[in-house]
UniProtKB/Swiss-Prot annotation:
This is U1 small nuclear ribonucleoprotein C. Residues 208-220 have a biased composition (Pro residues). It comes from Tuber melanosporum (strain Mel28). U1 snRNP is composed of the 7 core Sm proteins B/B', D1, D2, D3, E, F and G that assemble in a heptameric protein ring on the Sm site of the small nuclear RNA to form the core snRNP, and at least 3 U1 snRNP-specific proteins U1-70K, U1-A and U1-C. U1-C interacts with U1 snRNA and the 5' splice-site region of the pre-mRNA. It comes from the Eukaryota. One of its GO terms (cellular component) is commitment complex.
Length: 220
Protein backbone atom coordinates (compact mmCIF):
# COMPACT_ATOMS: atom_id res chain seq x y z
CA UNK A 1 0.00 0.00 0.00
CA UNK A 2 1.47 3.44 -0.91
CA UNK A 3 2.44 5.81 1.86
CA UNK A 4 2.04 9.55 2.06
CA UNK A 5 5.11 11.71 2.74
CA UNK A 6 4.64 14.95 4.70
CA UNK A 7 7.11 17.59 3.53
CA UNK A 8 6.61 19.71 6.64
CA UNK A 9 7.27 16.90 9.14
CA UNK A 10 9.70 14.91 6.91
CA UNK A 11 7.97 11.64 7.76
CA UNK A 12 5.97 8.94 5.97
CA UNK A 13 2.43 8.26 7.13
CA UNK A 14 1.30 4.71 7.73
CA UNK A 15 -1.47 4.91 5.09
CA UNK A 16 -2.37 7.12 2.16
CA UNK A 17 -6.01 7.57 3.13
CA UNK A 18 -7.97 10.75 3.69
CA UNK A 19 -8.71 9.92 7.32
CA UNK A 20 -5.03 9.36 8.11
CA UNK A 21 -4.06 12.61 6.39
CA UNK A 22 -6.70 14.59 8.27
CA UNK A 23 -5.61 13.10 11.58
CA UNK A 24 -1.99 13.97 10.84
CA UNK A 25 -2.75 17.51 9.61
CA UNK A 26 -4.73 18.30 12.76
CA UNK A 27 -1.90 17.18 15.02
CA UNK A 28 0.02 19.63 17.18
CA UNK A 29 3.45 18.71 15.81
CA UNK A 30 2.34 19.13 12.20
CA UNK A 31 0.83 22.56 12.83
CA UNK A 32 3.96 23.72 14.63
CA UNK A 33 6.15 22.49 11.75
CA UNK A 34 3.97 24.34 9.25
CA UNK A 35 4.25 27.59 11.20
CA UNK A 36 8.01 27.21 11.53
CA UNK A 37 8.37 26.55 7.81
CA UNK A 38 6.52 29.68 6.71
CA UNK A 39 8.33 31.81 9.27
CA UNK A 40 11.67 30.75 7.83
CA UNK A 41 10.93 31.35 4.15
CA UNK A 42 9.94 35.01 4.60
CA UNK A 43 6.93 37.15 3.87
CA UNK A 44 7.08 37.36 0.06
CA UNK A 45 7.73 33.67 -0.51
CA UNK A 46 5.05 32.72 2.00
CA UNK A 47 2.56 34.86 0.11
CA UNK A 48 3.47 33.16 -3.18
CA UNK A 49 3.06 29.71 -1.61
CA UNK A 50 -0.37 30.67 -0.26
CA UNK A 51 -1.39 31.97 -3.69
CA UNK A 52 -0.28 28.74 -5.34
CA UNK A 53 -2.29 26.68 -2.84
CA UNK A 54 -5.45 28.69 -3.39
CA UNK A 55 -5.02 28.60 -7.18
CA UNK A 56 -4.61 24.82 -7.10
CA UNK A 57 -7.91 24.50 -5.26
CA UNK A 58 -9.59 26.78 -7.80
CA UNK A 59 -8.09 24.89 -10.77
CA UNK A 60 -9.40 21.55 -9.52
CA UNK A 61 -12.82 23.01 -8.73
CA UNK A 62 -12.65 21.91 -5.10
CA UNK A 63 -13.90 24.09 -2.23
CA UNK A 64 -11.20 25.19 0.15
CA UNK A 65 -11.47 23.77 3.69
CA UNK A 66 -12.26 25.97 6.65
CA UNK A 67 -9.82 26.87 9.38
CA UNK A 68 -12.13 25.12 11.87
CA UNK A 69 -11.48 21.79 10.15
CA UNK A 70 -8.04 21.66 11.77
CA UNK A 71 -9.58 21.05 15.19
CA UNK A 72 -10.51 17.50 16.19
CA UNK A 73 -14.18 16.73 15.77
CA UNK A 74 -14.82 19.65 13.43
CA UNK A 75 -16.56 19.35 10.10
CA UNK A 76 -14.78 18.27 6.97
CA UNK A 77 -13.51 20.32 4.07
CA UNK A 78 -15.75 22.51 2.00
CA UNK A 79 -17.17 24.93 4.56
CA UNK A 80 -17.28 28.60 3.83
CA UNK A 81 -16.94 31.72 5.92
CA UNK A 82 -19.22 34.70 6.46
CA UNK A 83 -20.64 36.18 3.28
CA UNK A 84 -20.34 32.93 1.33
CA UNK A 85 -16.63 33.30 0.61
CA UNK A 86 -14.37 30.23 0.98
CA UNK A 87 -11.62 30.25 3.58
CA UNK A 88 -7.97 29.34 3.21
CA UNK A 89 -6.71 25.77 3.71
CA UNK A 90 -5.56 24.95 7.25
CA UNK A 91 -1.85 25.03 6.40
CA UNK A 92 -2.17 28.27 4.46
CA UNK A 93 -4.22 29.93 7.18
CA UNK A 94 -1.73 28.92 9.86
CA UNK A 95 1.11 30.20 7.70
CA UNK A 96 -0.65 33.49 7.11
CA UNK A 97 -1.14 34.00 10.84
CA UNK A 98 2.49 33.14 11.53
CA UNK A 99 3.89 35.41 8.82
CA UNK A 100 1.66 38.32 9.83
CA UNK A 101 -0.35 38.32 6.60
CA UNK A 102 -3.78 39.88 6.59
CA UNK A 103 -6.39 37.38 5.39
CA UNK A 104 -10.11 38.32 5.25
CA UNK A 105 -11.68 35.49 7.27
CA UNK A 106 -14.97 37.37 7.71
CA UNK A 107 -16.79 40.30 6.20
CA UNK A 108 -18.33 43.33 7.97
CA UNK A 109 -22.06 43.97 7.70
CA UNK A 110 -23.16 45.91 4.60
CA UNK A 111 -23.22 49.69 5.01
CA UNK A 112 -26.44 51.65 4.99
CA UNK A 113 -27.89 52.02 1.52
CA UNK A 114 -26.71 48.64 0.23
CA UNK A 115 -28.96 45.56 0.10
CA UNK A 116 -28.17 42.77 2.54
CA UNK A 117 -28.16 39.04 1.89
CA UNK A 118 -31.54 37.27 1.92
CA UNK A 119 -32.63 36.62 5.48
CA UNK A 120 -30.08 39.02 7.02
CA UNK A 121 -31.32 41.68 9.43
CA UNK A 122 -29.75 45.11 8.94
CA UNK A 123 -29.81 47.54 11.90
CA UNK A 124 -31.48 50.92 11.30
CA UNK A 125 -29.27 53.97 10.77
CA UNK A 126 -28.20 55.82 13.91
CA UNK A 127 -30.30 58.82 15.05
CA UNK A 128 -28.97 62.37 14.78
CA UNK A 129 -26.48 63.55 17.33
CA UNK A 130 -28.02 64.30 20.70
CA UNK A 131 -31.37 62.64 20.00
CA UNK A 132 -32.36 59.18 21.28
CA UNK A 133 -34.09 56.79 18.86
CA UNK A 134 -37.88 57.23 18.98
CA UNK A 135 -39.98 54.29 20.24
CA UNK A 136 -41.85 52.45 17.52
CA UNK A 137 -45.61 52.08 17.62
CA UNK A 138 -48.11 50.37 15.34
CA UNK A 139 -47.16 50.28 11.69
CA UNK A 140 -43.54 51.23 12.43
CA UNK A 141 -44.38 54.86 13.21
CA UNK A 142 -42.87 56.61 16.18
CA UNK A 143 -45.14 56.58 19.21
CA UNK A 144 -46.59 60.00 19.96
CA UNK A 145 -45.58 61.39 16.56
CA UNK A 146 -48.25 62.02 13.96
CA UNK A 147 -45.84 62.50 11.07
CA UNK A 148 -45.93 65.42 8.71
CA UNK A 149 -48.88 67.80 8.58
CA UNK A 150 -51.76 66.24 6.70
CA UNK A 151 -50.59 62.66 7.21
CA UNK A 152 -51.56 60.04 9.74
CA UNK A 153 -49.26 57.66 11.61
CA UNK A 154 -49.34 55.10 8.79
CA UNK A 155 -48.42 57.66 6.13
CA UNK A 156 -51.99 57.96 4.81
CA UNK A 157 -54.29 60.90 4.43
CA UNK A 158 -55.13 63.71 6.76
CA UNK A 159 -56.61 63.26 10.15
CA UNK A 160 -55.46 60.48 12.47
CA UNK A 161 -52.18 60.01 14.18
CA UNK A 162 -51.37 59.45 17.80
CA UNK A 163 -52.94 62.18 19.91
CA UNK A 164 -50.93 63.73 22.76
CA UNK A 165 -51.89 62.97 26.34
CA UNK A 166 -53.60 65.98 27.89
CA UNK A 167 -54.43 66.91 31.44
CA UNK A 168 -58.11 67.28 32.43
CA UNK A 169 -59.64 70.49 31.16
CA UNK A 170 -57.08 71.14 28.42
CA UNK A 171 -57.85 71.65 24.73
CA UNK A 172 -55.31 71.29 21.94
CA UNK A 173 -55.29 74.43 19.75
CA UNK A 174 -55.28 74.10 15.95
CA UNK A 175 -51.86 73.53 14.43
CA UNK A 176 -50.28 72.34 17.67
CA UNK A 177 -47.42 69.86 17.14
CA UNK A 178 -47.54 67.13 19.83
CA UNK A 179 -44.32 66.35 21.71
CA UNK A 180 -42.48 63.11 20.79
CA UNK A 181 -42.77 59.94 22.81
CA UNK A 182 -46.36 60.51 23.99
CA UNK A 183 -45.35 63.12 26.63
CA UNK A 184 -48.09 64.80 28.59
CA UNK A 185 -48.68 68.49 27.93
CA UNK A 186 -48.78 70.52 31.19
CA UNK A 187 -51.16 73.44 31.62
CA UNK A 188 -49.94 77.03 31.28
CA UNK A 189 -48.20 78.40 34.35
CA UNK A 190 -47.17 74.99 35.70
CA UNK A 191 -43.49 75.87 35.62
CA UNK A 192 -42.83 74.09 32.33
CA UNK A 193 -40.08 75.71 30.28
CA UNK A 194 -39.35 75.03 26.66
CA UNK A 195 -35.82 74.01 25.65
CA UNK A 196 -33.54 76.65 24.13
CA UNK A 197 -34.19 77.33 20.43
CA UNK A 198 -32.26 75.29 17.91
CA UNK A 199 -30.04 76.73 15.25
CA UNK A 200 -31.92 78.91 12.79
CA UNK A 201 -34.46 80.31 15.32
CA UNK A 202 -33.67 83.77 16.75
CA UNK A 203 -33.63 84.11 20.50
CA UNK A 204 -37.01 85.07 21.93
CA UNK A 205 -38.98 84.13 18.82
CA UNK A 206 -42.07 81.95 19.40
CA UNK A 207 -41.90 78.39 18.15
CA UNK A 208 -44.10 77.62 15.14
CA UNK A 209 -47.30 75.82 16.10
CA UNK A 210 -46.93 76.49 19.85
CA UNK A 211 -50.08 77.55 21.79
CA UNK A 212 -50.32 80.94 23.46
CA UNK A 213 -48.22 81.18 26.61
CA UNK A 214 -45.62 78.67 25.45
CA UNK A 215 -42.45 80.37 24.45
CA UNK A 216 -38.70 79.95 24.78
CA UNK A 217 -36.87 81.12 27.93
CA UNK A 218 -36.65 84.87 28.07
CA UNK A 219 -39.68 85.44 25.83
CA UNK A 220 -42.32 87.88 27.08
Amino acid sequence: MPKFFCDYCDVYLTHDSISVRKAHNSGRNHLRNVVDYYQQIGHEKAQSVIDSITSSYAAEGQPMPSVHSTTPGAGGAGSVGAGGFPLLPPSAAAAAAAAGLQMPLSLPPPPFGFPARPGMMVPPPPPPFGFPPPPLGRGGAAAGFSGFPGMDAAGGGAGGGVQPQLLPGMVVPPGFVPPPGGMMVPPPGAGFTMPPPLGGFPAGAPLPGAPPGYGPPGAK
